[in-house]
Amino acid sequence: MFNRKYLIGGLIGLARMDDFDRDVYCLLGLPVDAVGMAEAVRRVRAAVTDERRCFFSTPNLNFLIACQTDREFRNSVIRSDLSVTDGMPLVWLARLLGLPIGERVPGSDLFEVLRGDQERVGRRIAVFFFGGEEGAAEQASQVLNESDCGLVCVGFLNPGFGSIEDMSSR
């Protein structure tokens, strides 16, 4: 169930989140980078070039709902190096609240751009799949690694849709 106080606090907390080293805003309690597709691609490419980790999240309504009850999942979004709006409802809400988030940045579209980057960076970019429906990450890993593109899947994990605590007690 939603915590109304938390949701209202997230709505009222419109200020820039100053504890990040980038232009991040709070949207219903989650950090969202104020970037479009071009800047998101630039940041990922810069991380690849500099050989830095770039853990990015693609919040949508499902993320917002999951983050209300799953602390571990919420913390993973907060710890992301890049958090882009993957859902139009989030973009509309940001606009309504006056946040400078102007466009949807679908993770799948960002992924497709990076698939063609092998020549640009001189090697395949290592990716790790996390989450999704049962078996989807494994299948995506196999398909990606059998293709001739700029990405290689180095692993995947699908912990299911329960909380970390629930899965640990099984």
Where are these regions (language model features)?
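Conserved beta-alpha
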Residues: 91-170
